[in-house]
Amino acid sequence: MAEKAIDKPSKSTINTIHINNLLPITTEHLDDQDKYLTIDHVKHGAVGYAKYALEHPLKDRLVCTDTSRKKGKYKDSDGNIVSDPEMSSITKKLFLAIKERNSELITEYANDLKVKLDSFGSSNNEMTTEEAEDVTSLTDELIDLVTSIFSQKRQSREISDGLKPDLYHQFVKEIATGSYLSN
């Protein structure tokens, strides 16, 4: 029994090996990955941004070692292991790298929503009361979507400036869960 315990590597050893095998995160790498950010990522807010990050720029480059503290570890451009509490540094770098593309996608999405909204408002057809109520309900939903997407745009900019709005906390929670190093 004691021999089995000795032969089995500890969780700490396995984690260290995994962390040492991470690929480095460079500014160039993050900047190059923005092309993979899609309108679908944007539409899903923090969950979408986290999915993008975990599948593209942070894949094989970041691990979360403590989900409750949201403590991330990654290698910098010099190969040094960086411990990032609350993943604040990497989140800021990531949102700075996608800032322009994200803004373009949000504007595109908002314009699509505005076109839909205008099509409801310019309908020359006579409607029943029920149809009018449906259009009003859909119009309200579209207005809410436009408002929330511009809030998301503002919060994304704030994150790239180092602030921590609601979107930041939701994003980091998703990243921590998705990159947790479990054995």
Where in the sequence are the language-model features?
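Extended amphipathic coiled-coil helices
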Residues: 2-183
